Curated annotation (Swiss-Prot):
Originating species: Saguinus oedipus
Name used for this protein in its record: Kallikrein-15
Signal peptide span: 1-15
Known function: Protease whose physiological substrate is not yet known.
One Gene Ontology MF term: serine-type endopeptidase activity
Entry's EC annotation: 3.4.21.-
Matching Pfam families: Trypsin
Subcellular location: Secreted
Keywords per UniProt: Disulfide bond, Glycoprotein, Hydrolase, Protease, Secreted, Serine protease, Signal, Zymogen
Any one GO BP annotation for this protein: proteolysis
């Protein structure tokens, strides 16, 4: 098993070749207007979701001391107008978060200055129900992507690189019973599995904290899965947002 590590960790580690949004393609620019990029000391670290003008939701394992929030992004290396830079005044991981078991892998960030809502920057809707097996969803992120390059023998070899642009993958919700067969004894009722038939997780390291959106509703946060994620048919595991709506709303109200 593995945790979907923040990209800042991967960039300072060795031999981390698995991190990518598998089989994903570049998203239509600003088609995911709730998508957030979290930065640490000037480096892209994790994904996140805008849920209100003042609040961003991500994974607790993305927590760091120096977090900057970038909204309205598509190409991280170019500015085309709608981008907004914000600072987090409060970083609030779930009080029961457990790094070892991945339980309660959810975190709220309060922005010092609220987001200015535009067609390219707007909140995603929180769920009023939990997702159903087979429900169609989209996972998005700037995690590492793979591509084939000619190798020294002339045969194509898989290479990985950090994409400039936001990538999306179409996946669907996997039933708890089916997912439990892949991760026996590891799942809780605060986790949900999603993947693509015969292709596995789709999300991988670097996509951490990003949104799993089903029918315009935020149903999951990229959390953990199998390793190596570019060579598995097991689904990815996401924090099940519907189980945390009460905590989210109460925390926002108190802060």
């Amino acid at each position: 098993m593995w945790l979907l590590l923040p990209l800042s960790f991967l960039l300072t580690s060795t031999a981390q070749d698995g991190g990518k949004l598998l089989e994903g393609e570049e998203c239509a620019p600003h088609s995911q207007p709730w998508q957030v990029a979290l930065y640490e000391r000037g480096r892209f670290n994790c994904g996140a979701s805008l849920i209100s003008p003042h609040w961003v939701l991500s994974a607790a394992h993305c927590q760091s001391r120096f977090m900057r929030v970038r909204l309205g992004e598509h190409n991280l290396r170019k500015r085309d107008g709608p981008e907004q830079l914000r600072t987090a005044s409060r970083v609030i991981p779930h009080p029961r978060y457990e790094a070892r078991s991945h339980r309660h892998d959810i975190m709220l960030l309060r922005l010092v200055q609220p987001a200015r809502l535009t067609p390219q920057v707007r909140p995603v809707v929180l769920p009023t129900r939990c997702p159903h097996p087979g429900e169609a969803c989209v996972v998005s992120g700037w995690g590492l992507v793979s591509h084939n390059e000619p190798g020294t023998t002339g045969r194509p070899q898989s290479q990985v690189s950090l994409p400039d642009t936001l990538h999306c993958a179409n996946i669907s919700i996997i039933s708890d019973a089916s997912c439990d067969k892949n991760y026996p004894g590891r799942l809780t009722n605060t986790m949900v599995c999603a993947g693509a038939e015969g292709r596995g997780a789709e999300s991988c390291e670097g996509d951490s904290g990003g949104p799993l959106v089903c029918g315009g509703i935020l149903q999951g946060i990229v959390s953990w899965g199998d390793v190596p994620c570019d060579n598995t048919t097991k689904p990815g595991v996401y924090t099940k947002v519907c189980r945390y709506v009460k905590w989210i709303r109460e925390t926002m109200k108190r802060n």
